[in-house]
């Protein structure tokens, strides 16, 4: 069997070295013949820098993988096996603009929540569907792994408006799993079974099993005591009100602070915008540092500075998912896929982020116990926002946008 052809849309992203590292670590199970890094004219220099680093990393590993950097998406997609989507429509300047406009009007300016998430989705979804249409023609059997934000809305748009095989990914469940493993003082995170359910950046940990025992109450107690390693680097680590977690009986992901602790987060964002800058401005400076390192002809590993990006572990999750599909691993991962009844009270055709069994045929979402009514209403409200946003992005209808 010949090796795999893997295509990365947004190949000039600073995250790509983590993806390459993950592919190299799994080469014995998932042999890659060629890696195509696709970008646009504005990203031409970055994608060439990434391609150079990729070749050095591959050589250091003693492997032979063709690396192609290109602006020609069509030639890249032809006969691909897996396509990873990690592009940012409008680049970081658009994100910064979203943040600044939101804060100007006293609103949270986060790239996947509220006004910022809406604007990002409207820019991104039409491009994502263009890519999906290209895949229908050029690689109809390929899997699309989407971690372009807002991942849940982008994934749902693709699932509902194209015929390709697609799965959405997020690093938040990965970070939560690693954090819970730390709290349980467990050496191997694979021994910890975590069930999550909800929407992208709106998930709840519903169950934690280790060696046959339920540990959710103990982990909640640890978090309430001030030990919370479940927070990504890009989210302010405000302490949850203890009554909230006790009342929920679940662990909300860090992004739910934007809803349960909105006023605190808004004050923090306003203070940061007046000081070191918005998150987008901070990331822009970090990317300059990263690409200065990536240019170094002696660098042949993923630099530690990459851990400063909030999306740490996105690429790790992507490689694990590719491996699970390719080898029919039948492992549990937490992905964005069609609901199909997994969460009662949400449409069957909508995208949800749930624990799923990953097979060669894709993810099989695991049914979850009914949510408490108050939490379900929040999920339904957010899903209505997402579906109206998708409709507005595809139709350009201003009235639909206002409804969202």
Task: Give, region by region, the residue ranges found by the protein language model.
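Redox-cofactor binding/interface segments in oxidoreductases and associated redox assembly factors
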Residues: 78, 84-85, 146
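Glycine-rich phosphate-binding loop and adjoining beta1-alpha1-beta2 segment
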Residues: 28-62
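N-terminal Rossmann-like dinucleotide-binding module
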Residues: 5-31, 35-38
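Long, compositionally biased stretches enriched for glycine and/or charged residues
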Residues: 188-404
């Amino acid at each position: 069997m010949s090796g795999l052809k893997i295509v990365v849309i947004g190949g000039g992203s600073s995250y790509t070295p983590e993806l390459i590292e993950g592919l190299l670590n799994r080469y014995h199970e998932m042999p890659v013949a060629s890696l195509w890094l696709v970008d646009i004219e504005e990203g031409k220099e970055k994608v060439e820098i990434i391609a150079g680093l990729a070749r050095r990393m591959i050589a250091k590993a003693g492997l032979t993988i063709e690396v192609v950097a290109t602006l020609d998406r069509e030639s890249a997609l032809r006969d691909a096996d897996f396509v990873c989507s990690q592009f940012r429509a409008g680049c970081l300047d658009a994100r910064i603009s979203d943040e600044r406009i939101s804060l100007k009007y006293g609103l949270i300016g986060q790239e996947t929540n509220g006004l910022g998430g809406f604007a990002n989705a409207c820019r991104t979804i039409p491009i994502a569907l263009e890519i999906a249409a290209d895949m229908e023609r050029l690689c109809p059997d390929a899997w699309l792994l989407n971690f372009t934000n807002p991942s849940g809305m982008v994934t749902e748009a693709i699932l509902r408006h194209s015929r390709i095989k697609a799965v959405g990914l997020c690093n938040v469940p990965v970070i939560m799993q690693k954090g819970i493993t730390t709290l349980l003082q467990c050496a191997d995170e694979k021994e910890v079974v975590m069930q999550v359910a909800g929407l992208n950046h709106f998930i709840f940990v519903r169950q934690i099993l280790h060696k046959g025992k339920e540990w959710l109450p103990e982990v909640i107690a640890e978090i309430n005591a001030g030990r919370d390693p479940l927070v990504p680097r890009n989210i302010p680590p405000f302490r949850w009100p203890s009554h909230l977690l006790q009342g929920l009986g679940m662990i909300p992901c860090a992004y739910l602070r934007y809803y349960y602790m909105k006023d605190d987060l808004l004050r923090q964002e306003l203070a940061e915008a007046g000081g070191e800058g918005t998150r987008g401005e901070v990331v822009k400076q970090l990317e300059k540092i990263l690409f200065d390192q990536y240019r170094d002809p002696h660098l042949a590993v993923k630099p530690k500075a990459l851990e400063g990006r909030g999306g740490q572990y996105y690429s790790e999750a992507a490689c694990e998912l590719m491996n699970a599909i390719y080898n029919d691993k039948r492992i549990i991962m937490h992905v964005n896929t069609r609901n199909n009844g997994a969460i009662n009270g949400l449409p069957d055709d909508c995208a949800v982020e749930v624990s799923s069994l990953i097979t060669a045929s894709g993810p099989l979402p695991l049914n979850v116990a009914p949510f408490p009514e108050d939490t379900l209403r929040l999920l339904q409200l957010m899903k209505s926002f997402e579906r109206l946003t998708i409709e507005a992005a595809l139709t350009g209808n201003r009235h639909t946008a206002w409804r969202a």
